[in-house]
C-alpha cells in the first residue's frame, strides 16, 4: 500500500537519498530546502511510503500572486519505479492544493520524465532553464 503524507523535518536525510537517485537533478544546492524546518512546517514537502519506507517525495510551493502551484522536485527511489508512486504523488498534489494549475520544469533529455508527465496529461508551455528544459503545466 502507498501512503502519501506530510514529511517530518527529521526525515530530510531519507528524502535526500531518494532525491540523489533521481535523474537530471541539478547539483542539489537546493538541498537546503530539504533541511529547512520551515519547508516541512508549511507542508511543502510530502513523502510516499511503500511498505513503511520512504520511496518517493515531492516539494511544492503554492504561489501567492498567481493561481498556481509549482512543483520544484519529485523523486521516486530506483527500486520503487513502476509501483505507481509518481502518479500517486501528483494525484495527491492535485487533491490537496488550493490552486487548480500545477507547473513544473523538466529537462528535455529526460525522456522517462517527459513520458511520465505526458501520460498524466501535462501540456508543454514552452522552453525553460536556458533552453535545457521544458515548462509544463496541468489544469484540472
UniProtKB/Swiss-Prot annotation:
Keywords: Acyltransferase, Host-virus interaction, Inhibition of host innate immune response by virus, Restriction-modification system evasion by virus, Transferase, Viral immunoevasion. It catalyses: 5-aminomethyl-dUMP in DNA + acetyl-CoA = 5-acetylaminomethyl-dUMP in DNA + CoA + H(+). Residues 2-140 form the N-acetyltransferase domain. CDD domains: NAT_SF. It comes from the Viruses. The keyword Cytoplasm does not apply. GO terms for biological process: symbiont-mediated evasion of host restriction-modification system; symbiont-mediated suppression of host innate immune response. GO terms for molecular function: protein-N-terminal-alanine acetyltransferase activity. Acetylates 5-aminomethyl-2'-deoxyuridine (5-NmdU) to produce 5-acetylaminomethyl-2'-deoxyuridine (5-AcNmdU) on DNA as a step in the pathway leading to thymidine hypermodifications in the viral genome. As a final result of the pathway of hypermodification, 5-acetylaminomethyl-2'-deoxyuridine (5-AcNmdU) substitutes for a subset of thymidines in the viral DNA. These modifications probably prevent degradation of viral genome by the host restriction-modification antiviral defense system. Belongs to the acetyltransferase family. This is 5-NmdU N-acetyltransferase. It comes from Pseudomonas phage PaMx11.
